[in-house]
């Protein structure tokens, strides 16, 4: 919105309309001691060239872009084909909105349809929606969907689910009038995988769903088939959460292992990690009419027009739009359409072979780094289960926070200090590796860890 200052004539006219004679009279309700009686302490304005130099000087103070980062924990830096950046700027794509007159925008609808197809193939489930806000909101919506489908209220959450995702579920559940008592947490086993025996004990006749990470927050890959069997025996649904879908380029899909609903964070597939987003949530479920009617968000379907020409439409729109709020399966407004478009473009450019090759590089580099760290005195890998490209390290000296601060002085972000999330894990560091890390990057981290003095 433009800012146009009021003229003296306009100010006088407004004062007359409210029966006042001056601005002083207008502000009389504000105590004098609370008023600013001097000019603001601001430097004089700059011309454009001077302003650009000033901003460049400020930008130079930011070290983040020059740091070697091994952060993950839900946001990952992969290589994206740069051609998509230019394509996204085309006017027919550059909007976050699903079209208000959707059938007119066949190009946009086709892109969303292709996005749904990609999500369906990655998650291994036939029904995928047009995107969610992010992985956390996708999980929360999946939990609400499971409650509607089963008529039950209880949710069992494995300790391997991202803590922020659990917080989002708590917020959504509170929003529908249910309390935290309907959410039950179960710690992971000693090897880092979901504790099947503990989950089995936690599931009862009021349990709507069980949520497990695949891979989980600690990077661990567990066999979720056993969890699926227990869930289905007791009438509960299994929901899986994937933080980096690149893992599913190598692993069996959640759908093939028995998941009823699978959600994931789509940021790694085509969005650079930034402070606060933007992100995009992936959501897929079983091919069942009851599930289809309860899927949150929008669905794009393929059809033909009266001439027999293929076209795309919003399918079952009255399930989610055009009805009363309390009857809708969700209430997404401005959705992640542009982010979904970016993911679609970049995944199509990468291709299936490129997707698998990048995932193989992630795995190989992470395994190499694990071996090198395990050789260092004072370091160990506390979780014995397989991992993809993220893993937990028990650090020398028992203080991961101190280690991360020391390595930051060397220009290295060593990973996430897990003590910031759970005080019991203050001696553990969560490290993530992607195909963007070179052998020299890995060697630099190992050298930094080796030289750390508690």
Swiss-Prot record:
TM segment ranges: none
Superkingdom of origin organism: Bacteria
CDD domains noted in UniProt: GDC-P
Pfam families linked to this entry: GDC-P
Catalytic activity: N(6)-[(R)-lipoyl]-L-lysyl-[glycine-cleavage complex H protein] + glycine + H(+) = N(6)-[(R)-S(8)-aminomethyldihydrolipoyl]-L-lysyl-[glycine-cleavage complex H protein] + CO2
Keyword set, alphabetical order: Oxidoreductase
Biological process annotations from GO: glycine decarboxylation via glycine cleavage system; nucleoside metabolic process
Keyword check for Phosphoprotein: no
MF annotations from Gene Ontology: glycine dehydrogenase (decarboxylating) activity
E.C. number: 1.4.4.2
Cleaved signal peptide residues: none
Gene3D superfamilies per UniProt: Aspartate Aminotransferase, domain 1, Type I PLP-dependent aspartate aminotransferase-like (Major domain)
Family the UniProt entry places it in: Belongs to the GcvP family. N-terminal subunit subfamily.
Annotated function: The glycine cleavage system catalyzes the degradation of glycine. The P protein binds the alpha-amino group of glycine through its pyridoxal phosphate cofactor; CO(2) is released and the remaining methylamine moiety is then transferred to the lipoamide cofactor of the H protein.
Record-linked HAMAP family: GcvPA (MF_00712)
Subunit structure: The glycine cleavage system is composed of four proteins: P, T, L and H. In this organism, the P 'protein' is a heterodimer of two subunits.
Designated name of the protein: Probable glycine dehydrogenase (decarboxylating) subunit 1
Organism: Sorangium cellulosum (strain So ce56)
Lineage: Bacteria, Pseudomonadati, Myxococcota, Polyangia, Polyangiales
């Amino acid at each position: 919105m433009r800012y146009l200052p009021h003229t003296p004539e306009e100010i006088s006219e407004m004062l007359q309309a409210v029966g006042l004679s001056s601005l002083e009279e207008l502000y009389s309700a504000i105590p004098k001691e609370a008023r600013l009686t001097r000019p603001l302490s601001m430097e004089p304005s700059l011309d454009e060239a001077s302003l650009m130099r000033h901003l460049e000087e400020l930008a130079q103070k930011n070290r983040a872009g020059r740091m070697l980062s091994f952060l993950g924990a839900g946001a990952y830096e992969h290589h994206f084909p740069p051609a998509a950046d230019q394509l996204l700027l085309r006017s027919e794509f550059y909007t976050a909105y699903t079209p208000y007159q959707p059938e007119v925008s066949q190009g946009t609808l086709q892109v969303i349809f292709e996005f749904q197809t990609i999500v369906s193939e990655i998650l291994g489930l036939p029904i995928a929606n047009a995107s969610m806000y992010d992985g956390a909101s996708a999980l929360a919506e999946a939990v609400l969907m499971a409650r509607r489908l089963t008529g039950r209220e209880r949710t069992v959450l494995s300790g391997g689910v991202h803590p922020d995702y659990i917080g989002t579920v708590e917020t959504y559940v509170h929003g529908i009038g249910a309390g935290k008592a309907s959410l039950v947490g179960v710690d992971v086993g000693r090897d880092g995988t979901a504790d099947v025996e503990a989950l089995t004990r936690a599931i009862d006749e009021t349990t709507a769903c069980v949520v497990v990470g695949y891979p989980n927050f600690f990077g661990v890959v567990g066999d979720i088939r056993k969890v699926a069997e227990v869930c289905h025996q007791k009438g509960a649904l299994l929901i899986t959460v994937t933080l980096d879908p690149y893992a599913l380029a190598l692993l069996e899909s959640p759908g093939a292992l028995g998941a009823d609903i699978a959600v994931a964070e789509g940021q790694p597939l085509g969005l650079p990690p930034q402070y606060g987003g933007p992100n995009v949530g992936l959501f897929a479920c079983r091919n069942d009419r009851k599930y289809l009617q309860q899927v949150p968000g929008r669905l794009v379907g393929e059809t033909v027009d009266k001439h027999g020409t293929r076209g795309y439409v919003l399918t079952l729109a009255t399930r989610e739009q055009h009805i009363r709020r309390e009857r809708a399966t969700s209430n997404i407004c401005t959705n992640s359409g542009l982010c979904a478009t970016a993911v679609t473009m970049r995944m199509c450019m990468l291709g299936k072979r490129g997707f698998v090759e990048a995932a193989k590089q992630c795995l190989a580099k992470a395994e190499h780094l694990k071996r090198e760290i395990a050789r260092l005195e004072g370091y160990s890998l506390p979780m014995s289960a397989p991992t993809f490209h993220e893993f937990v390290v028990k650090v020398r000296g028992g203080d991961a926070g101190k280690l991360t601060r020391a390595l930051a002085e060397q220009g290295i972000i060593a990973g996430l200090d897990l003590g910031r999330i759970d005080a019991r894990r203050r001696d553990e560091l969560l490290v993530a590796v992607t195909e963007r890390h070179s052998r020299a990057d890995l060697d630099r981290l190992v050298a930094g860890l080796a030289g750390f003095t508690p």
